[in-house]
Amino acid sequence: MTVVMAVACQPSEWSEAERKIINGQGEIMRVLTVCNETDSLVLRSKCSPISNRELESSEYATLAEKMVATVTSPEQDGVGIAGPQVGILRRVVAVQRFDKEGFPFEVYPNVKVVNHAGEKKIGGEGCLSIPGKHGNVARYQEISITYTSVKTFNDTTEHIKGFTAVIFQHECDHLDGILYTDYLEGLN
């Protein structure tokens, strides 16, 4: 029983359901919302890591490409998106890097917030999975993250500040089934 659970928690390859979502038609993926009961259950689920073998796969490359295309599409126009928001319960996020020249979107597999500094600051947040709502959330302005480099497959640590740090915290929360509304200081 324990072995089966360990395998279930640490998949070694993409499931058929994941492949179907990743390789679905079009470059824009459907964004799950809390308005749909089934979607809401997915959004409240914890995510599994992505293995090195999976990071080398065409499915991962397609997923990364489609996540960026989805979050930047005119229908969404977001600054970040996480695996569960497109139906993939894996630890992967795409984040717009406002701390880098040109504000590029970058994809981070197996990302985790591992440290924070300073005090939290309250700021407005919204979410692609909670359309039409915004609220004030207290977040750290300085964090450290770790993620798996797709070039070396080693854990990489990065220190991030400002609005980009807020985006990472929001997206990493999604990977643990947490929505920004769980922290709300005021919903409009």
For the regions a protein language model found, what residue spans apply to each?
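Positively charged
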Residues: 8-188
